[in-house]
Amino acid sequence: PWDGVLQAFDFGPTAMQPTPGASDDFYDREWGTDPAVPMSEDCLYLNIWTPALRGYGADSMVASEKLPVMVWIYGGAYQCGGTFEKEFDGTHLAANGVVVVSVAYRLNAFGFMTHPLLHEEAVERGDGEPYANFGFLDQRAGIQWVKENIAKFGGDPENITVFGQSAGDASVLAQICSPMNHGLFQKAIMQS
């Protein structure tokens, strides 16, 4: 917690994931996780690009018209990736009058654990649902935060589009299908 304005210009740590090392493979070179990017279990951050705010502190001014909001969910086979990827920087979309938010979520076993004991616990509870899709819940928490707070960044909480690519595309489908998300967003774009 802090008081006043927090000027957050750097990406937070990304989720724990394998790195390609010194690979010269095209995919690793172009989209692989940069070993210089810090990784941590403390990885649940949002990045916001908004054309609505001008300046900082006392000089800041919010546009009077609420802007549409786009929430980005990155891909990477639920194993790698993050909000830091230069290919998915929200600067250009925001320059066109859209508030862009990228949502971080846990990956690999931290986000999508599967184990026979989880199934057994679900059977014992009687609901048949193993609670291990933490990555999807992280995404949902990010979308909910956007819904509750995006107006402070000039965005319209009633005009939210969730979009993603690859595993982010499948995540968008999961978010669409979840009854927990009723009313959190209005539109979706699935890219692969």
Where are these regions (language model features)?
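Non-catalytic accessory segments of hydrolases
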Residues: P1-F134, P157
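Alpha/beta-hydrolase fold nucleophile elbow
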Residues: P68, N133-F134, V146, F153-S166
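Active-site loop->helix "elbow" adjoining a glycine-rich segment at hydrolase catalytic centers
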Residues: G75, F134-D138, S166-D169
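Conserved hydrophobic residues forming the short capping helix/wall of the S-adenosyl-L-methionine
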Residues: N108, I150-A151
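Short, well-ordered amphipathic alpha-helical segments that serve as non-catalytic structural scaffolds
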Residues: Q139-K147
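Primarily recognizes the serine-hydrolase "nucleophile elbow" in alpha/beta-hydrolase
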Residues: A151, E158-S192
